[in-house]
Amino acid sequence: GCDLLLEAFAQVAQQDSRLHLVMAGPDQTGWAATLKMQAEELGIAERITWPGMLQGDDKWGAFYVAEVFCLPSHQENFGIVVAEALACGKPVLISNKVNIWREIENDSAGFVDDDTVEGTVRNLQRWLSLQPKEYVRMSEKARACFESRFHIQRAAERLVEIIRCSIQ
């Protein structure tokens, strides 16, 4: 989905010169060079930071200074990085191929759309159209979504309940 995000960001960034994108994560497949070339061709290279894999305080710091987290993934079994963003109170913009999209949508913890450039553009535009109060409310809902669904204590309680039900 990184290619989709670059295409969508290029379209949306034309409307707001303040936008900046951080493309963080490991380059396990050597795809970063191709993505950087795509960013050059789209004319957005100067508006993107490529820190690579972020860990520890660097990762958490990046989450906390971000306004929103965007993952237009083609396929995610769970999306731990989405849960991490929610834990930091960051709304998420994800594709409907991230397997926790229903929880995000049900809890109003972000926006969900198709796994396409158009869907990613819609997510970004919806995000940018929020009023400050709406942004604050969605941030609160993002954190609440994490606490109620993905916090380790809550997950352990659900697992124990599933086991109890299965042995009765």
Please annotate each region the language model reported.
Residues 74:
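Aromatic "clamp/platform" in nucleotide-sugar-dependent glycosyltransferases that forms part
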Residues 133-149, 158:
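A short, well-ordered alpha-helix in the C-terminal region of glycosyltransferases
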Residues 91-95:
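Short hydrophobic beta-strand element within catalytic cores of glycosyltransferases
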Residues 53-54, 61-66:
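Short alpha-helical donor nucleotide-sugar binding micro-motif in glycosyltransferases
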Residues 20-34, 52:
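Glycosyltransferase donor-sugar binding loop
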Residues 33-54:
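Nucleotide-activated donor-binding/catalytic signature segment of Leloir-type glycosyltransferases, i.e.
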Residues 1-11, 21, 33:
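A conserved mid-protein helix/loop that constitutes part of the nucleotide-sugar donor-binding site
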